[in-house]
Amino acid sequence: MHAVNTLTGRPTEPVLIAGAWRTAATVSSFRAVDPTTGQEREQLWPVSSWSDVDAALDAAGATAAELARLPGERIAVFLERYAERLAARGQELVAVSHAETGLAIEPRLANVELPRTLNQLRQAAAAAREGTWRMAMIDSARNIRSAAFGLGPVIVFPPANFPLAYGALTGGDFAAAIAAGNPVIAKAHPGNPGVSRRQSHLP
């Protein structure tokens, strides 16, 4: 389901930029739609202005060089610990995902999508640790050396129907970007913004 845009009221949800929650520079707001009833939900969510977008891009750009220098082991440990925290809150994340998307708790979310999500993060951790994704090559005859590196900030736009496995903060795109040393700008899907909100508040 798509969210419904509205200019009535003021959203209370903040945005997370450069590691800090702040009031959104709102140009409009929206309410997600309950997929089981077709009715708007009560919670108002902000639609950020270009100033928020620019701030997120600036923060990600400033972080890119630092993240690119991190050893693969440190990135791997982060991804593994993140997967552990997601697993610990799995039941809660599944419940929110079900409420916002209407997808079945079992077997779809709890038995298929959540395990897949955790596995993706752990596979990304293994790739970061091994470094094989760099595909380093040395051509001694031509004195050419090559290797893959992170590209810089990556923006993840999640779909409506995979709130966890393709989520902006948990999905395969997120995991691959982090494993390769890229900072991520995550945009919540307007149909299930509460899922991303919950993912961003892991203890």
Residue ranges and their predicted role:
Residues M1-A141:
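N-terminal Rossmann-like NAD(P)+-binding subdomain of aldehyde/semialdehyde dehydrogenases
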Residues R134-P203:
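Conserved small-residue-rich beta-alpha loop and adjacent elements
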